[in-house]
């Protein structure tokens, strides 16, 4: 039997800003400017939008002009701030056949609680398009309308734990990346993958890892164990308080809830976190684990 051997395939060149992955290349002119920029990541359903929205309000309570950008096709990042699901940038652009010059700022920027400005970038339909394009178009619009000139802090609230080139694109604008995680295996496993993505981006962009925000957890023993192993640190801790769940159902932030010891406790922790971020958190040079090593590290003997 004659067998035809194919010549070996040449190795694909590695992209400059990722561990061999295909990354979305952003326009180098799309620089946000002088605002402090934070990207919030974490496992899907862990409370990133709740964390982002309450952090945005806390920053505004400290006198800062804050812009929150939701980067999720569900476009529900800012609904506790605006009390509704606002149209996405992509929805608005489609209405004008992507002629962005026809848009005004109030077509896609909405004012939320305590003056926090809100934008929902949205995303392409499932299975199509690229989230990086959506983020790029959003930043481009904000730049064209000079909306970033009067902003002190930008918060990117990013889809789930997706760290592909598209939804990793906010890292290309961020100063610090924050990870929301619970004290459980799935959250920490996702956090480890996100750490790897952030470290890959930091080779060619200013973004650095800022730390983890422990959420929905009475204890932090597993997070602490992981942090000690890879060189991470916890920036804030929010227990699984029922007032946080109720605030989402009431479509409001914690800063609008009726006063109670738990509400005050959570508010104070958000204000403390906001103040520490404004003061500047040292960059973390964590070394992510191999997947199998996490299985060996976490849990009980």
Swiss-Prot record:
SUPFAM superfamilies: P-loop containing nucleoside triphosphate hydrolases (SSF52540). Pfam families: Fer4_NifH (PF00142). It catalyses: chlorophyllide a + oxidized 2[4Fe-4S]-[ferredoxin] + 2 ADP + 2 phosphate = protochlorophyllide a + reduced 2[4Fe-4S]-[ferredoxin] + 2 ATP + 2 H2O. [4Fe-4S] cluster binds at residues 130, 164. Keywords: 4Fe-4S, ATP-binding, Bacteriochlorophyll biosynthesis, Chlorophyll biosynthesis, Iron, Iron-sulfur, Magnesium, Metal-binding, Nucleotide-binding, Oxidoreductase, Photosynthesis. ATP binds at residues 45-50, 74, 215-216, 239-241. Its cofactor is [4Fe-4S] cluster. Residues 1-13 have a biased composition (Low complexity). Pathway: Porphyrin-containing compound metabolism; bacteriochlorophyll biosynthesis (light-independent). It comes from the Bacteria. Binds 1 [4Fe-4S] cluster per dimer. InterPro entries: NifH/chlL_CS, NifH/frxC, P-loop_NTPase, Protochlorophyllide_ATP-bd. One of its GO terms (molecular function) is metal ion binding. Residues 1-22 are annotated as: Disordered. Its EC number is 1.3.7.7. Mg(2+) binds at residue 49. GO terms for biological process: light-independent bacteriochlorophyll biosynthetic process; photosynthesis, dark reaction. The keyword 4Fe-4S applies. HAMAP family: ChlL_BchL. Homodimer. Protochlorophyllide reductase is composed of three subunits; BchL, BchN and BchB. Component of the dark-operative protochlorophyllide reductase (DPOR) that uses Mg-ATP and reduced ferredoxin to reduce ring D of protochlorophyllide (Pchlide) to form chlorophyllide a (Chlide). This reaction is light-independent. The L component serves as a unique electron donor to the NB-component of the complex, and binds Mg-ATP. Belongs to the NifH/BchL/ChlL family. This is Light-independent protochlorophyllide reductase iron-sulfur ATP-binding protein. It comes from Bradyrhizobium sp. (strain ORS 278).
